[in-house]
Structure formats: structure tokens, C-alpha cells
Amino acid sequence: MENFRIAKFLMQERQGIMIMKFYGRETERKKLNSMFCTDGQMISLIYGRRRIGKSELIRQVLKETELKSIYYECKQTTEQNNVDSLSELVGETFDFPKPAFADMESLLRFLFRTSEKEPLILVLDEYPYLRENVKGLDSVLQSVIDEYRDRSNMKLIICGSYVDTMKELLAKQNPLYGRIDLTLNLKPMDYYESALFYPDFSDEDKVRIYSVFGGIPYYNRLIDGKKSVRENIIDLIASPGARLENEVSMYLSSEISKITNANEVFEALAKGFSRYKDILDQSHVSSGPALVDVLDKLIRMDVVDKITPINDENNRKKSGYFISDNLSLFYYKYIFRNSSRMNIMDSDIFYDRYIAEDFETKYVPKVFEDVCRQYLIRRNRKGLMDEIFEKIGKYYYDDPVAKKNGEFDIVTQDDKGIFSMKQNSAKNL
């Protein structure tokens, strides 16, 4: 019998209640399907920032397999409440009355024991919620995994959005260390996968949309193909009460305790300050160590990147920090500092006055550099470059005669040590 929740999802889809086409993630899907086809017990860890599409990926691969599966979304409630909820799914999956279990350990042992007879996929989505409410859950899992390792056919997927918490499961001191067979850290999609969500736009407009909404599937599903780029931006983020108006601040608040420092850092980065000293001066963060903590956290959250020049990778003075999440970049560049104005102005007038010109002449061309980099990486992976490169990045140079310095936006280096200059020349799209 198919898992009840997955079967219900498929039935709704056929009836037109829920039709969501799945895009991209080919590599991740192949790895998970390969795991399902592997004999014996397999444990997988899937993590990544919220809205990145973890649950959607899992649901998709569950639809693609014939194995019996249980998908459970852990709750922020007591252990017994979670046990009761998961027990209901167990009864539905195996077509018998809801079983009674004293605790999560006894339930897990039952499922692992059952998988001795036939393969079973168990998904524990939002695992950190369960971990908070089941004392020593990592140790419990470790004990069950070890006990049944040589005789179960369990395919366990542990999934979560709190990146730091999920990474703890991979640490040497964690009971689950060495027991994870497959780790998937889901990153934002690149331009080429993201553009699949809005196929009816021109290539130029696809770049414009990507420059705002980036590679987060949840955001891209909100794009209305019947509206213009401008209308989508206004409706989704650049107007009072817009669907994504508070998305960035809510995400940061859920991950960072001192949101004021994060706001200060983001504002400095959005203004173009990328060097550590400049960010410290502009952001008014209380101290150097405090700034380091904020930057490190933002990097772990996949919203900021630290970039060093390809020709001087160990020179800390030439390292730069940049906002890598497009929605965060757009928000802090145009919305955050102007939110009071936006709330009392006509949305079209606000867009024309504070967004339109800079967006076309500076913002989009800058993001286009990243699209070009992604293009080169894709061609390189497919072996289509004349010279297969091993590194790609920025190239900084000093001109002692002219007494100035500069940079090439995109540079590649092959195994011969030859640099290939790929400088972006787009000014307007």
C-alpha cells in the first residue's frame, strides 16, 4: 500500500487541486533514486536554507519510486504528540489500526525491524523540531541504526532547515558521525534552472527576474507570466503588504539573535562596501569580533559570500564580502532604507523614483556577471570549453605606472597556469 499522504498528494494533483511542476535538481534526484535502489540500510542527510525546496525534492523522488514510504513532518510539540502523529501514518501505510508506542525509540525500532522484510523509506522532515523535544534523539537514532545496520533495508532521510543544527549531525563529536551515507546540502538554483519557472519571458527579462528573486524555488513559483517584470517586482516585494516584503527580515530573525547587526552589515554591503575594514566603518557594528561573527553566520546561511581574487587567494586584504542572495540584495538596496517612503507612496511612483534607473543601469548588469560565471561553469562541467579550467573567479591587478588598481570580473585558470580573461561588457540588457 502506498503511503497515504503521498497517495493523497497524487490524487489531488490528478484532480487539478494541486498541480506543481517540478524543475531542476537533476543531480540530487539521481543520487536519492540511486540510494533507494541500493541494497541494505542507507541513511541520508538533506539540509539547506528555508524555501530552498528540500521538502519538494523529497516528495518528487517519493513519487518516482515504487518503494513503500512514510513522509513525516516533525512538529514543535511534545515527544508523545509526535509519536502519535507518526503512528497514524504507520497504520495508514501498512493498512492496520494505529499502533501504540511508548516513545520515539520504540517506534523507530519497529520501523527498522519492519524494513527487514521489505525496503522502507522513512522521511523525518524538520528534524530539528523533533530533536528539541526528544531527549538524546541523536543517540537514540545511532543505537537503532547500529543495531539494524546488517539486516534492515531502511532508507532514512533526515531533513532540516536550520543549517547549523543539521551540520552538527556531521560533526565528529555527534553520535551520528560516520553513519550518514549520503549528504545533500541544497543550494539555490542557478539562473538556468531558475529560468525554467518563467519560460514565457524574453532572455533579457529572465535575467531581470533572476536578479531579484534568485534561485529560491518558492519565490520563483510566485512569478506571474502574464505580468511584466516591473509588475511582478512591485506586486511581490516593492509595495506595502507585498507577498515577500517581510521575507528577508523574517528569515534573518529566525536564524540570527542580533538582527540589528545583520541589518547594518547588509546595508553596508548593499551600498557596495565589500572590504572588511570598510564594512566595519560603515556598519557601526560594535567591534571587529562582533562583525566576524555576523559575517560568518551570514556565510553559513548562504546569503553572503566571501570572495578572494584568483591570483592572490591568501591575501586577506583583498578579500571581499558580497550579498549572494538576490532577494536580500534587492531588499537592502531598494526597500529596507526606503520602506517608510514606500508605505505612503503610489507603488509605481516609488518604483520609478527609487528603483527603475539604478536597477537597469547598475543592478542587473552586476548580477549578469554571475550569470556569465554560471554559464562558463556549466560548459566546463560538460567538457565544452577549449581548455578545461580548474579555477574561476575575479582577477585583481595593480598598475604602478598609472598608480591605480582594478579587476577583471571573471577569470579562469587551466592546468597550464594560463589565465583566460572573461570580462563582462554588458551595460544595459
Give the ranges of each region predicted by the language model:
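Accessory nucleic acid-recognition modules appended to NTPase machines
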Residues: 225, 230-410
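Short glycine-rich substrate-engagement loop in P-loop NTPases that contacts/grips substrate
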Residues: 87-115
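Active-site beta-strand-loop-beta-strand hairpin of nuclease catalytic cores
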Residues: 412-421
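Interdomain motor-coupling "hinge/lid" segment immediately C-terminal to the ATP-binding subdomain
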Residues: 166-262, 266-270
